[in-house]
């Protein structure tokens, strides 16, 4: 029970944000920066980098990634099956393209919800980001001229804490 709370029966474990006394809120913790928050200064930017989304499927044409890069894509998002999977033939072609050009490629999931874990080789894992959100994040990172490791770090900010 609590002497100052209208809801007298509650759990006393951590998790509450604070309490009210005389209609004034008192917080237990200072505001925290949200997980995954990255600041991009776009003050002098008029255009974002071109990033294309390729929807993966069985028998995906392996030349799609090469055609996207040839038409000006500076980064690619693979909207993969399950947790970001693409066919082995398309993966081999994308890997060869990455080795030849260094164009960043992000593995995402096309399902409504889910997570793409890190450790998928040459691609950057999108974590919880769907293809549309991953595209915007990659556009921002490329516009700020982030390198591959910086891009990996930006996406890793959305991963759950281990």
Task: Annotate the PLM regions.
Residues 1-75, 81-83:
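Accessory alpha-helical/coil subdomains and C-terminal extensions
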Residues 67, 80-162:
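C-terminal non-catalytic interaction/assembly regions of soluble proteins
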């Amino acid at each position: 029970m609590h002497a100052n709370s209208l809801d007298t029966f509650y759990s006393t474990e951590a998790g509450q944000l604070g309490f009210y006394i005389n209609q004034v809120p008192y917080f237990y913790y200072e505001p925290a920066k949200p997980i995954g928050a990255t600041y991009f200064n776009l003050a002098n930017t008029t255009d974002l980098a071109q990033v294309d989304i390729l929807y993966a499927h069985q028998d995906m044409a392996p030349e799609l990634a090469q055609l996207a890069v040839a038409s000006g894509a500076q980064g690619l998002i693979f909207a993969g099956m399950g947790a970001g999977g693409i066919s082995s033939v398309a993966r081999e072609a994308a890997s060869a393209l990455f080795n030849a050009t260094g164009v960043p490629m992000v593995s995402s999931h096309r399902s409504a919800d889910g997570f793409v874990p890190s450790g998928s080789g040459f691609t950057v894992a999108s974590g919880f980001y769907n293809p549309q959100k991953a595209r915007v994040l990659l556009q921002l990172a490329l516009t700020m001229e982030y390198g591959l490791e910086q891009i990996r770090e930006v996406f890793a900010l959305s991963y759950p804490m281990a």
